[in-house]
UniProtKB/Swiss-Prot annotation:
Protein name: Serine/threonine-protein kinase NIM1
Modulation of this protein's activity: Activated by phosphorylation at Thr-229, probably by autophosphorylation.
UniProt organism field: Mus musculus (Mouse)
Source organism superkingdom: Eukaryota
Gene Ontology terms describing biological process: protein phosphorylation
CDD domains (UniProt xref): STKc_NIM1 (cd14075)
Modified residues (Phosphothreonine): T229
A molecular function (GO) term: protein serine/threonine kinase activity
InterPro entries given in the database record: Kinase-like_dom_sf, NIM1K_STKc, Prot_kinase_dom, Protein_kinase_ATP_BS, Ser/Thr_kinase_AS
Cofactor(s) needed for function: Mg(2+)
Amino acid sequence: MTAVFVNGGGLVNTHCDRWERRDSVESSCQTEGGKDSEEDQQRQLTPFEKLTQDMCQDEKVVREITLGKRIGFYRIRGEIGSGNFSQVKLGIHSLTKEKVAIKILDKTKLDQKTQRLLSREISSMEKLHHPNIVRLYEVVETLSKLHLVMEYAGGGELFGKISTEGKLSEPESKLIFSQILSAVKHMHENQIIHRDLKAENVFYTSRTCVKVGDFGFSTVSKKGEMLNTFCGSPPYAAPELFRDQHYVGVYVDIWALGVLLYFMVTGTMPFRAETVAKLKKSILEGTYTIPQHVSEPCHRLIRGVLQPTPTERYGINYIMSNEWMRGVPYPTPLEPFQLDPKHLSETSTLKEEENEVKSTLEHLGITDEHIRNNQGRDARSSITGVYRIILHRVQRRKALESVPIMILPEPKERDLKKGSRIYRGIRHTSKFCSIL
């Protein structure tokens, strides 16, 4: 497939007031659904037309919109998480019944710097095509709020799993770490630095499959380019973030991977302190110990990644071919796919999965005319949202997103490391980006 990156792969306009605002019903309920006519009323409405009509006329649906229980084509359920400047709620897409995660931001609290971070988050997610990276489906804007509609990972955070069940076994750690490594490699190959890699930002979709999410601190950085803002969670921060005025983004992500691996195999953090000042001192001194139960190959890998000097750290390719990871399969990036459905109406030569997506859209009542009228709206369109959800569903069904198979012990049989209990109820909060 040919990649068509929304906004040319660059940053979205950072001024919220210049983003195209829309009502939940897409321009007074008529832009996408069309005006009612006698002919329309005589035939059975398509699911798309019925939903669009209900959003204008059905008392229950209108009340849900008024009470904030519905936004666009999504019914909003309970809260499933919170971020630095947002809350995350579970949503149900009314046409496809797909569960989604909706990140909600209050526009009145978005200063210029936060708007830039949000723009980068959207841009980063749309440039990446990997089975272990959370997908962005749609951006919905109202007068007071912004909603990022994303893939839902219902298995919870890696942090929560380890905090409640204890450390992972080394075979399980290898399986999970291989997926994270592959995702981060894909980011770096696309010049994207995550800057907030941690167990709280790794999400389970099944017992053996994880996805990296929360690109709120991500940025585009060319090879060797120096950055000068502190982003992320202090326990995962590389020493150069405390020591130097500039840093190379790739090395900072690599360090965070080392901290993450340590946490996975031990159930504790390598650097622990009661205050940020003491934590900084510990990281700069490089003082940490690895428990004896950790195998020697894993021990050497952790030591090789957590090197104080950035250029002496193991690179991601070396980590992936390291003796501890030997024999572990790595997921591969997906072929770049179209982020906008316009190609479905422009050519008769479509691939099998594209034909299936188009057929499903037509079954829902989304026609070539709707798709043509949708051009230029990118992620800020319910048509695009439906398309991306269906495309992702087709790719999952065709095993383009395969789930690793591994026999794991039940949680009650696992070694519940006592040290992990200190993390129960505690989250590592990411700090706002600030100039070093």
